Design a protein with these regions (language model features):
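Helical lid/core segments from catalytic subdomains that handle acyl or acyl-like groups
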Residues: 92-149
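A short, aromatic/hydrophobic, helix- or strand-capping loop or linear motif
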Residues: 68-75, 124-130
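Broad gene-expression machinery/nucleic-acid interaction feature
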Residues: 30, 83-87, 138, 152
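Small-residue-rich loop/turn and linker elements
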Residues: 69-101
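Acyl-group handling in specialized metabolite and lipid biosynthesis
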Residues: 31, 40-47, 95-110, 156-157
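N-terminal beta-alpha "docking/capping" segments at the starts of catalytic domains
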Residues: 1-50
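Acyl activation and transfer enzymes in specialized metabolism, enriched
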Residues: 40-65, 155-171, 175
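Catalytic micro-motifs at enzyme active sites that drive phosphoryl/nucleotidyl and oxygen chemistry
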Residues: 18-20, 75-78, 151
Length: 175
């Protein structure tokens, strides 16, 4: 069971923003941007490990280190989860795709092992479940062919995050 803290929205420093955005039909956020992944790519080649899993680890660390990214609005209450888990899409062996994810851990070896195991399981066949959007999950899509802005992938937040800065947990937001 995921652990979380309930935020008292009446005394919350972000009450005015919460009141404003909670009136939106879909008050979610997202961002997309080219990221310099040279360091992760070099590490993956040197260690003969999966670039996808390695980048997912770095990204998951950043998502968990930013308290605002762990906020969720569930059943009329704002929750800050202790940890959030990555959700991602994998290509199946038959050419289809499958949604999968695993429990987050800061331990790299354990994270890598969990991700690798889930990817292998979900590559074999499409598994269905009742809910793919657990409250303690963040969904990620890493598409290497998307470049710049597009009408389809228009972000709410635009970020320029070189991987070296991303590891340091900076998220500059512009226009």
């Amino acid at each position: 069971m995921a652990k979380f803290e309930i935020i008292d929205t009446n005394t919350w420093i972000r009450k005015s923003q919460f009141d404003f955005f909670s009136t939106f039909l879909n008050p979610d956020y997202g961002f997309n941007k080219k990221i310099d992944v040279t360091t992760v790519l070099e590490y993956s080649k040197e260690t003969k490990t999966s670039f996808f899993i390695n980048f997912l680890y770095v990204f998951s660390l950043a998502m968990n280190d930013i308290p605002e990214m762990r906020l969720r609005y569930v059943n009329g209450e704002v929750r800050r989860y202790d940890l959030i888990n990555p959700g991602y899409t994998v290509k199946t062996n038959d050419g289809s795709f499958n949604n999968c994810g695993h429990e987050f851990t800061r331990n790299y070896q354990e994270f890598y092992s969990r991700a690798h195991e889930q990817i292998e399981i979900h590559k074999e066949k499409v598994l269905t479940r009742e809910n793919y959007n657990d409250n303690d999950r963040f969904l990620t899509m890493m598409v290497p062919i998307c470049e710049g802005d597009s009408a389809i992938l228009k972000p709410v937040f635009k970020t320029d995050i070189p991987i070296s800065e991303f590891i340091k947990k900076f998220i500059p937001v512009k226009e």
